[in-house]
A protein has these predicted regions:
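Alpha/beta enzyme core
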Residues: 1-298
Length: 298
């Protein structure tokens, strides 16, 4: 059969991986459009983040303003990745011609081809849905995609109450599905595993051995099981996801360096050098929890 090459995804994924392994950290900002992405490149950023809440609010194919609950059509984010990459490629082409024509000095060249890390939400379903979504991100030229361990049909913003976890094993199946899509496409797509277990108090069922230590024995009116939220539950899941992801992200309710360090230390004790991600969210009340100096150095 015909072998299709996904050269943009392959190039950008490799570029992101090299950046992650050569820089102390990579700071990104959420980009809402192709023009926005171009401005981020001009500002000197080395990567671009595509946020699901931004897609929900103002960049989805339904043309609606949604809350951050995965209500938008599932192909919205891949389409935005494609739009951003098209804008970045065009900016790079224009710059190339300006250098050739002598209108711009080569030493002033901007790196427009920034790798895009996209929000895959909770996958919009099960492993098959995750597989298809990952394929669309690959076709669009994404460098990385993150998936979270919430129940897709009950998905909430990471800083809202009422989050429902899927069993640890179910999340691992989703991560495997994303990796399978990348392997079939022959691309080194960067896969990030996000856990919402630090704040989530509900889980769909009680069958997974990794989740049993955190069960309270109580049930919700919807039939979900209550679990003990907290950093220990998040660590348990981070350790379980580590073999199946390139980076691990622990979603926190506040900008908390102590929690971040505890999570990082626990992961690195078993998986030395494992790459981690942190959400410096605009939803945080930074002033309430940190001083100006702490915010500046966060």
């Amino acid at each position: 059969s015909l072998k299709i090459e996904y050269s943009l995804c392959k190039h950008q994924s490799t570029k992101l991986w090299n950046l992650l392994n050569s820089e102390p950290y990579i700071n990104t900002l959420g980009s809402l459009s192709g023009n926005h992405a171009v401005q981020h490149a001009k500002a000197g950023l080395k990567a671009i983040y595509l946020s699901g809440w931004q897609v929900a609010a103002d960049a989805n194919s339904a043309g609606e303003m949604y809350p951050d609950q995965s209500l938008y059509p599932y192909d919205s984010a891949p389409k935005l990745v494609e739009s951003m990459n098209n804008a970045l490629i065009r900016a790079d082409q224009i710059q190339h011609m300006e250098i050739i024509d002598g209108d711009m000095k080569k030493e002033n060249k901007v790196d427009y081809m920034l790798p895009i890390i996209a929000d895959g939400e909770a996958g919009f379903g099960g492993p098959l849905n995750v597989f298809e979504l990952a394929k669309k991100f690959i076709k669009a030229g994404a460098a990385g995609v993150h998936f979270e361990d919430q129940l897709a049909s009950e998905k909430k913003c990471g800083h809202m109450g009422g989050k429902v976890l899927v069993p640890t094993g179910t999340m691992i199946k989703n991560l495997k599905a994303a990796r399978l899509a990348a392997d079939i496409a022959n691309v080194p797509l960067i896969i990030l595993a996000r856990t919402d277990a630090n704040a989530a108090k509900l889980i769909t069922n009680d069958h997974d051995d990794n989740d049993k230590p955190f069960l309270t024995g109580e049930r919700s009116p919807e039939g979900f099981y209550y679990v003990k939220a907290g950093i220990d539950q998040a660590i348990s899941r981070g350790l379980a996801y580590a073999p199946y992801s390139d980076l691990i992200w622990c979603e926190t309710a506040t900008p908390n360096l102590e929690e971040a360090k505890k999570f990082a230390d626990a992961i690195h004790k078993k998986f030395p050098g494992k790459l981690l991600a942190y959400n410096c969210s605009p939803s945080f009340n930074w002033k309430k929890h940190l001083s100006d100096d702490e915010i500046a150095s966060f």
